[in-house]
Amino acid sequence: MHGRLKVKTSEEQAEAKRLEREQKLKLYQSATQAVFQKRQAGELDESVLELTSQILGANPDFATLWNCRREVLQQLETQKSPEELAALVKAELGFLESCLRVNPKSYGTWHHRCWLLGRLPEPNWTRELELCARFLEVDERNFHCWDYRRFVATQAAVPPAEELAFTDSLITRNFSNYSSWHYRSCLLPQLHPQPDSGPQGRLPEDVLLKELELVQNAFFTDPNDQSAWFYHRWLLGRADPQDALRCLHVSRDEACLTVSFSRPLLVGSRMEILLLMVDDSPLIVEWRTPDGRNRPSHVWLCDLPAASLNDQLPQHTFRVIWTAGDVQKECVLLKGRQEGWCRDSTTDEQLFRCELSVEKSTVLQSELESCKELQELEPENKWCLLTIILLMRALDPLLYEKETLQYFQTLKAVDPMRATYLDDLRSKFLLENSVLKMEYAEVRVLHLAHKDLTVLCHLEQLLLVTHLDLSHNRLRTLPPALAALRCLEVLQASDNAIESLDGVTNLPRLQELLLCNNRLQQPAVLQPLASCPRLVLLNLQGNPLCQAVGILEQLAELLPSVSSVLT
């Protein structure tokens, strides 16, 4: 077989590769050691740039070596002439571009480029925008490059309209571009700022309708791509609610004033200050949260001195001023009354969704019908199903309540991995609907039984509720936010899966608590109930703790004020 090329065996090939790797490793370690020695000795010269170039050219993610290069460049700035420094910077920019070709998603390389350009007196931002465009042509989802482009656009004061046009070009080329859609959500509010009186964070209606048409084209082209669906969800999002005092409640019995707000706030911080006026005179009080935790909360309360509740006067006027929101609310406590309150006459638009014009309602109704048609063609498309639900919520949550629940069942079957999330979202929507119905009826009783709830939310909306029925659901716990229900007298929570009562604390009016057929294991889990001073009736039938020896004696010691315990 003379004259034929000898072919290496697999073992020989493996050995050759091993030797090659060892040689590269030795060179890598040798260069790295030399860099660190020079750095320790303070020899920050161009030889360090050469050594680090050898390493970073192959592995741009060595962050420490980028730090070394910055130290060298800072040193050379004081030693080089302007012409020499310009040549050095030009070479550094070229080296950075070569590193990005090795790894276009190198954190260290992009950061070093930002640092370098930030030190130049007159950077060539046009060149940097072209660089971004080239790398985004290779990978339009490179979020490192997108971050860098936003940095460049900010530094160069590129008009938002030009950047929006750039996203148009990329989206037109490929709808599946989450970064482009996200960038649009940042640019459009800059291009179309709302007046001070308008809803902040939202778009003018004509712009919104055009964007809805664009994104609809995207998800009809590729129904399974999630980026357009997420952008569509942002478009449907409600505006940031205006700061408001939702409800003000005064109790003579508890000598307490309670306030609920449109958003969580931390009273006592530099920006969040509450002032209390009683009969037009300022009163210094200490504010606290219902659950005693010093953290942002929708509900805050304070104790009132006896003088401010004197029943000899015909009435007392309480006014709370929220300085950050520049809003205030007042209520009157009449002689002979044990409580007084003032509550916003809220509508569903103010509480949970945006108010829709006739034109926008027509467009959303058309979108809903189109999504239903798409769902018939793509019956297992989870994004389409979820969007149908959200469109129904945006249009009329009460009108579409029954249909929405049916779509939730379909969505859970299509996407079983997110069943828990969908159960919680469904619970949230059901509770919102129940709050709306209660608002319209102007009652203080809320029935949430047999709704298959898995979570409780919006409890700050229930400040005035006296009777709450949560029985026959799938609740595993009662959240600390339950302490916001300062007027609650009767709580029915039987036939759930409740294991903890940590949230049932500091309810000053709670008299009856029904917890039949839950999963309460030990008497110790009832300890939080000791903070409810008026609790007299406690029904624990059907819970595992009822089987404990001497349970009645333990409960009598644990909850001495409860006169009737059913086990």
UniProtKB/Swiss-Prot annotation:
UniProt keyword terms in alphabetical order: Leucine-rich repeat, Phosphoprotein, Prenyltransferase, Repeat, Transferase
PFTA repeat windows: 44-78, 88-122, 124-158, 159-193, 207-241, 363-397
UniProt GO cellular component terms: cytoplasm; cytosol; plasma membrane; Rab-protein geranylgeranyltransferase complex
Pfam family, one: LRR_1
Example GO biological process: endoplasmic reticulum to Golgi vesicle-mediated transport
Activity control mechanisms: The enzymatic reaction requires the aid of a Rab escort protein (also called component A), such as CHM.
Modification type Phosphoserine: residues: 98
Family matches, as PANTHER family: GERANYLGERANYL TRANSFERASE TYPE-2 SUBUNIT ALPHA (PTHR11129:SF2), PROTEIN FARNESYLTRANSFERASE ALPHA SUBUNIT/RAB GERANYLGERANYL TRANSFERASE ALPHA SUBUNIT (PTHR11129)
Family: Belongs to the protein prenyltransferase subunit alpha family.
UniProt protein name: Geranylgeranyl transferase type-2 subunit alpha
Species this protein is from: Homo sapiens
